[in-house]
Amino acid sequence: MLSPKRTRFRKQHRGRMKGKSYRGNCICFGRYALQALEPTWITARQIEAGRRAMTRYARRGGKIWVRIFPDKPVTIRPTETRMGSGKGSPEYWVAVVKPGRILYEMGGVSETVARAAISIAASKMPIRSQFLRLEI
């Protein structure tokens, strides 16, 4: 599963997702892509599940690029713990995704295979997303 090798600080503020994605919103590597239409946090497990689903469907053909990386730690307090005594410990990692962000790219396969593989990956995501084709 994806996670940073090391970070400057162990814990982060939650922050807020406003506006749309101006970086990482166009196809750079492959011919087909999955683009997010809503803001959300996508966990490392969800990213990996989508990647595995695409790889399994495409078999050996084609190449897949994961365009998001989970670099934000999410902390969780133990259950039945009283309030106070600091912030919880980091439990898992998320990628902050804004509308317009490209999640996955795919190349080296036909459009029908790419569309099917990307739709399977899209069903693993917690948001609405759309299939994009590189216009040449």
From Swiss-Prot:
Which cysteine pairs are covalently linked by disulfides here?
A: none
Q: Which InterPro entries match?
A: Ribosomal_uL16, Ribosomal_uL16_bact-type, Ribosomal_uL16_CS, Ribosomal_uL16_dom, Ribosomal_uL16_sf
**Which molecular-function annotations from GO does this UniProt entry contain?**
rRNA binding; structural constituent of ribosome
Question: Where does it sit, as one GO cellular component term?
Answer: plastid
Where does it reside? Plastid, Chloroplast
What top-level branch of life does the organism fall under?
Eukaryota
Q: Does the keyword Chloroplast apply?
A: yes
Q: What is its main location?
A: plastid
For this protein, the record's Gene3D superfamilies field holds: Ribosomal protein L10e/L16
- Keywords in alphabetical order, please: Chloroplast, Plastid, Ribonucleoprotein, Ribosomal protein
**Coiled coil located at which positions?**
none
> What biological-process terms (Gene Ontology) are attached?
mitochondrial translation
Which is a Pfam family this sequence falls into? Ribosomal_L16
Q: Which family does it belong to?
A: Belongs to the universal ribosomal protein uL16 family.
- How would you summarize the oligomeric state and partners of this protein? Part of the 50S ribosomal subunit.
Task: List the NCBIfam families hit by this protein, alphabetically.
Answer: rplP_bact
Record protein name field: Large ribosomal subunit protein uL16c
Recorded source organism is Oryza sativa subsp. japonica (Rice)
